[in-house]
């Protein structure tokens, strides 16, 4: 995980926001990755679409390997997904989606959130895209959604002068600051949707 590593093993980045003294506890939460054994499409996406319908609409957030789950859910139940937030997604697959699928995403507010130190190694198998490549891919994905007249944004804290966030943004010391930024974005989308609904009633 990029911000748990520094310029060399055992030395975290000076500005890291992750509580490095807790890394051992984090590692104990790990379980074997069994995603390769799942059927395709991933049954979690189907379950999310059912849950969204039961709730009569939901705002979906995905992180890391599950980062794209909101997108898959939107394709199954586009009218039940109110907004999508992808936190450090494993990939935005910018060149995989068809124009028709992009058109679906363009109808739902979308936010991608990425941390810091994109040039750090991932320590994943050779050939796996690095952090910068993943970030660039999400930027291209956002551009495609915007080109289709969608509301899509990238929240990259370093651009706002907020540095040191890790892959586990929700556990970082500045997690509440990032949460506030996400909440403000979501509030803005809610206000925009209410404005459109009000305009239709006039």
Please give the residue ranges for each predicted region:
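Active-site machinery of serine-nucleophile hydrolases
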Residues: 1-37
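Active-site signature of alpha/beta-hydrolase-fold catalytic machinery across serine-
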Residues: 72-76
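Conserved acidic catalytic loop of the alpha/beta-hydrolase fold
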Residues: 41-59
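Conserved alpha/beta-hydrolase fold motif
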Residues: 60-61, 84
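A conserved short beta-strand
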Residues: 79-93
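The feature captures the conserved acid-bearing segment of alpha/beta-hydrolase catalytic domains
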Residues: 89-157
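Catalytic active-site module of serine/aspartate enzymes centered on a nucleophile-bearing elbow/loop
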Residues: 164, 168-202
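Gly/Ala-rich beta-loop-alpha elbow adjacent to hydrolase catalytic centers
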Residues: 61-70
């Amino acid at each position: 995980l990029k911000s748990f590593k520094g310029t060399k093993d055992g030395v975290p980045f000076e500005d890291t926001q992750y509580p490095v003294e807790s890394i051992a506890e984090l590692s104990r939460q790990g379980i074997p990755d069994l995603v390769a054994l799942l059927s395709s499409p991933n049954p979690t996406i189907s379950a999310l679409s059912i849950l969204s319908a039961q709730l009569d609409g939901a705002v979906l957030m995905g992180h890391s390997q599950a980062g794209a789950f909101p997108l898959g859910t939107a394709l199954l139940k586009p009218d039940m997904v109110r907004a999508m937030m992808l936190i450090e997604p494993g990939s935005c697959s910018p060149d995989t989606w068809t124009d028709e699928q992009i058109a679906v995403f363009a109808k739902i507010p979308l936010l991608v959130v990425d941390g810091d130190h994109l040039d750090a190694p991932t320590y994943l198998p050779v050939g796996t895209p690095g952090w910068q490549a993943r970030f660039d891919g999400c930027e291209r994905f956002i551009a495609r959604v915007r080109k289709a007249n969608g509301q899509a944004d990238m929240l990259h804290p370093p651009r706002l002068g907020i540095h040191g966030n890790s892959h586990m943004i929700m556990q970082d010391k500045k997690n509440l600051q990032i949460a506030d930024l996400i909440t403000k974005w979501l509030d803005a989308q809610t206000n925009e949707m209410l404005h459109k609904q009000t305009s239709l009633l006039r």
